[in-house]
């Protein structure tokens, strides 16, 4: 099965190997740290040639994701990969995320991450929500009730920028710990993940509950769900980096 051109995955080719590590590991390894039985990436010519220099074969990594997506669709019989947006929508269905198939992929990804964050906030007590808002530097929260604080956090996430990326990394890391048994390399930066302790528990509980239901549906979801979350987070990181570059260019004029 060859890579099917996918505009939503083309940005992966711009990333460094360190960025692609998490996606590679999601596609290749399971929770026990063992290779997935149906993974094809480590037997590929590209992997044998370049090893952990993932940036050299980002397209092959994208192809692997399309392959796992095809396990959830009838097109697998045809030997064709499935485009990322189709995989993402399928994942959103499993996670009971509201979305419009006709909207941009980035908005669907935002809805997916927002849903996980929203469910996490529902599981927190008032003090945890307040403390998280303080960590995220949300101002004037002293007189706000829990509902207003949760709404402020979700609004902050949807506004984009560094705080949105920070929240996305926290969510993605918690999901990875629950589903894969380990965190993401993206979450290694303490500046990004100071609020991690407030979300790990609730997110872990939610995903564990969801996982119990969807695990029966097929092993492909053990890959496509965390893979979509990682891709969404990597896209936010790219947007954040591009935004910083534009700011520097404007300042230098």
Swiss-Prot record:
- What protein name does the entry list? UPF0174 protein HP_1588
The family assignment reads:
Belongs to the UPF0174 family.
Q: Which InterPro entries match?
A: DUF3944 (IPR025217), Ubiq_cyt_c_chap (IPR021150)
Q: List the Pfam families hit by this protein, alphabetically.
A: DUF3944, Ubiq_cyt_C_chap
Q: Which organism is it from?
A: Helicobacter pylori (strain ATCC 700392 / 26695)
| Domain of life, source organism | Bacteria
């Amino acid at each position: 099965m060859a890579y099917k051109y996918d505009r939503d995955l083309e940005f992966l080719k711009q990333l460094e190997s360190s960025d692609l590590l998490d996606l590679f590991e999601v596609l290749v390894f399971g929770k026990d740290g063992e290779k997935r039985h149906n993974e094809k990436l480590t037997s590929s010519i590209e992997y044998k040639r370049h090893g952990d220099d993932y940036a050299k074969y980002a397209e092959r990594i994208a192809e692997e994701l399309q392959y796992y997506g095809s396990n959830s669709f009838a097109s697998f019989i045809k030997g064709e990969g499935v485009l990322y947006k189709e995989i993402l929508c399928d994942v959103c269905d499993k996670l009971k995320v509201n979305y419009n198939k006709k909207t941009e992929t980035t908005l669907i990804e935002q809805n997916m991450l927002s849903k996980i964050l929203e469910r996490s906030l529902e599981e927190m007590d008032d003090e945890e929500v307040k403390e998280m808002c303080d960590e995220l530097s949300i101002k004037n929260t002293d007189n706000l009730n829990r509902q207003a604080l949760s709404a402020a956090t979700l609004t902050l996430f949807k506004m984009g920028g560094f705080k949105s990326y920070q929240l996305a990394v926290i969510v993605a890391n918690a999901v990875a710990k629950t589903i894969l048994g380990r965190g993401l390399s993206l979450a290694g930066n303490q500046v990004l993940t100071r609020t991690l302790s407030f979300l790990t528990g609730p997110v872990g509980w939610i995903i564990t509950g969801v996982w119990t239901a969807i695990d029966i549906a097929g092993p492909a979801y053990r890959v496509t769900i965390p893979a979509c979350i990682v891709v969404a987070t990597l896209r936010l990181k790219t947007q954040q980096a591009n935004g910083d570059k534009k700011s520097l260019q404007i300042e230098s004029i």
